[in-house]
Amino acid sequence: MFGEKVPSSEFINRSEYRDKVLGCWTGKNIGGTLGAPMEGRREIFDVKFYVQDLKGKPAPNDDLDLQLIWLLAVEENGIYQVNERVLGEYWLSHITGPWNEYGVGKVNMANGLVPPLSGAFNNEQWKNSNGAWIRSEIWACLFPGAPDDALEFAWCDACVDHADDGIYAELFTTALESAAFVESDIRKLIDIALAKIPADCRVARSVGIAIREYEAGHDFKTARNAVVEDLSLIHI
């Protein structure tokens, strides 16, 4: 079903790189600000513009803030001195969020369980949650067009407070985002990212369903419902 597995080897110049990083960060800001008032709710919304009074400023967003902490770790240590334990130390020193998987990972680390144990122990409820893949862009931006290199750091990142599909989700998005610096074909990007995660994991299964629905000509709501229905069957 899935085709090409490697990105283009096209060279990216400094100007193009800067433009894509700016687009990545700005787009993330826009999406996070648009969705912030609806976070935690499960119904489908039809949002065409901001619903809050922003006074010209984006909403606070941990999806972005966490990535700035990772960038700080890279700047202070050098990229190849950063690993899961270093990221765990920066988490304890700089990140205050106590909720869900963030809180579990932080409590585990405070009690001496270093990553990757911090993301797996006593975390059955949240280990597959979305707190890791939402902070994956930084690794793609640091390794543009080099998904395999980016994945090493995405794993170190995700295992601080996730396990299993919570990690696979970040690997998927990181690979896709890194390859997107040199490849524009969306289907090729999806194929590249799928090749980096287990074919039988929930992330790959859900992406496959979304592709199937798209190829059948169904709209995004139908595709979304098909994914949700499949996940509900898994949990029965």
Predicted regions and their residues:
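Active-site-adjacent bridging/hinge elements
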Residues: F2-V6, P37-Y50, G103-L117, L142-F153, ...
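An N-terminal structural lobe/cap that precedes and organizes the functional/catalytic core
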Residues: V6-Q67
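Conserved aromatic-histidine-acidic binding/catalytic patches
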Residues: N13-R18, K55-D62, E75, I79, ...
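Aromatic-rich carbohydrate-recognition surfaces in CAZymes
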Residues: P58-L87, W91, I95
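Short, charged, surface-exposed loops that flank catalytic or proteolytic processing sites
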Residues: G78-E84, V182-L189, D219
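Amphipathic alpha-helical interface segments
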Residues: E89-D200, V207-Y214
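Small-residue-rich helix-loop
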Residues: V203-L231
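Conserved small/polar residues in nucleotide/adenosyl-binding loops
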Residues: I234-I236
